[in-house]
Amino acid sequence: ENNRVVIDSRINESGTVYYASDSDYQKLYSVDKNSANRQKLSDNSVCELEMYDNNVYYLSKNDRHLYRANDITGEEELINKTVNKIAVDDGWIYYQESDGGKKSGVLYRMNIDSGDVERLTDNSVRYPKKYKDYIYFNLDNDNIMYGITLDGTSLVKLSMGDSDVKLYPFNCFYHGDYLFVEN
């Protein structure tokens, strides 16, 4: 067996690394911190890895379905069939619903324990990115950058988005309480 592993997406939780292996078509694996006990967790090609409460949440690259895989039992469960982007935090899954194959869609959050779903935005959004207590995004029809609180109660406009200045969440990086934008 090839002992060389190329890692694409990865997350580290208490000494275990979860990753999509480039050498196995982005299948989901885990390995402990000393590179022993490598274990395949899914036959799906995966992306958008998130860890919460002994579960790895991910999107299947083939159909963009949202799954949960238990890191102990290896059990997989289909959570949602229409997802583009995900973030998991404090008992909630935040996701962008797929809009007919487009890279835009309405933002939702789902309670992990109850399965209750709440709509966060009325309009379709692009490029959602969660940081601390906000999800940043552009609307589908403009270049203005917004932030919305995780419960959807407060919307903040962060840029004017005129024709000369276009701000996108994927051009941002975060440090402490600051949001930095590369333009």
Where are these regions (language model features)?
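Short, intrinsically disordered, charge-balanced linker/junction segments flanking boundaries
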Residues: 1, 177-183
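Beta-propeller fold detector
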Residues: 1, 39-43, 77-81, 118-122, ...
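An edge-strand/N-cap motif at the start of beta-rich repeat modules
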Residues: 1-36
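Repeated scaffold domains used in trafficking and secretory/extracellular systems
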Residues: 4-12, 44-53, 81-90, 122-132, ...
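Generic beta-strand structural signal
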Residues: 11-12, 20-22, 51, 59-61, ...
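Residue position within the beta-strands of beta-propeller blades
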Residues: 17-20, 57-59, 94-96, 136-138, ...
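Structural motif
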Residues: 24-29, 63-68, 101-108, 142-147, ...
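Short loop/turn segments that connect beta-strands within beta-propeller blades
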Residues: 32-36, 69-74, 111-115, 149-153
